């Protein structure tokens, strides 16, 4: 049985491939666009059966000529995730139409289809629950994800031939994101700031939040891969699900976890947030004027629906997840 993973050389895709490998599954077709060649490193530690360029894959899907038999599932992680890319033509073709073509093909062939949606569909909302009235995307990236989620909702009412699951990822961090540049997680950037400068910067107070007190639902990519595989194991489940921890934690906590993990590797003792600030290992910079009124100061996934679907595993909190991530970066990137 063959499994297809799109975006397989990317951040989440490569972690799904790795998680499948840990189950002994290697009959995997990895689909990606390696024009950014350094992404190959994410697959170098994985076992796959074949690599297929994204454009050739799309052509074969659209012409219904993919040569693989007994495809067990498609994990669709291939998309433009740059929220600052405002090229609507590219975004809608790459994120919406590509995903729609894959959905149609999977439904025709009765193949389970698990795809990456995004918490960006909620825009600046304060309630993050999988309900249409709460969804107000602020950019074309969020809209591309939102629009496809609406397609799934309509298809579910009409009746599906095979499982379809969309995961609304919140703030994902973890190994294999180094190719993402400015779009990499805050944990990644804090690690490199601390290693280069000996301190990390956080935004100061804004919008009623104190220094570094803005919060996010930070979720480890290890947990993201686990949830994907849980639904792979349960093909009777379809729908749209938030994929976060259900906790909202401060950037202060993330910065402290990163700095303390780096300090531990240096044989230095853990310090409290107060001590880290006093020693200027965490510093605050004025909140940028350009972001005022546009910045989301709070996110927290409502994971009620995920729990109701039977997923019972506990998620890493920031301290434990970042500690694991920093150890990986010290071994692989430092």
Curated annotation (Swiss-Prot):
Keyword entries, A-Z: Carbohydrate metabolism, Isomerase, NADP
Main EC class the enzyme belongs to: isomerase
EC number, UniProt record: 5.1.3.20
Needed cofactors: NADP(+)
GO BP terms in the entry: ADP-L-glycero-beta-D-manno-heptose biosynthetic process; carbohydrate metabolic process
TM regions (residue ranges): none
Residues annotated as catalytic: 141 (proton acceptor), 180 (proton acceptor)
Binding site for substrate: 171, 182, 189, 203-206, 216, 295
Entries under InterPro entries matching the protein: Epimerase_deHydtase (IPR001509), Heptose_epim (IPR011912), NAD(P)-bd_dom_sf (IPR036291)
The keyword NADP is assigned to this record: yes
Free-text cofactor note: Binds 1 NADP(+) per subunit.
Biological or metabolic pathway of the protein: Nucleotide-sugar biosynthesis; ADP-L-glycero-beta-D-manno-heptose biosynthesis; ADP-L-glycero-beta-D-manno-heptose from D-glycero-beta-D-manno-heptose 7-phosphate: step 4/4; Bacterial outer membrane biogenesis; LOS core biosynthesis
Binding positions for NADP(+) per the UniProt entry: 11-12, 32-33, 39, 54, 77-81, 94, 145, 172, 180
Catalytic activity annotation: ADP-D-glycero-beta-D-manno-heptose = ADP-L-glycero-beta-D-manno-heptose
UniProt GO molecular function: ADP-glyceromanno-heptose 6-epimerase activity; NADP binding
Pfam families the record matches: Epimerase (PF01370)
Subunit record text: Homopentamer.
Domain notes: Contains a large N-terminal NADP-binding domain, and a smaller C-terminal substrate-binding domain.
Role played: Catalyzes the interconversion between ADP-D-glycero-beta-D-manno-heptose and ADP-L-glycero-beta-D-manno-heptose via an epimerization at carbon 6 of the heptose.
Family, similarity comment: Belongs to the NAD(P)-dependent epimerase/dehydratase family. HldD subfamily.
Entries under NCBIfam families matching the protein: heptose_epim
Protein name per UniProt: ADP-L-glycero-D-manno-heptose-6-epimerase
Originating gene: hldD
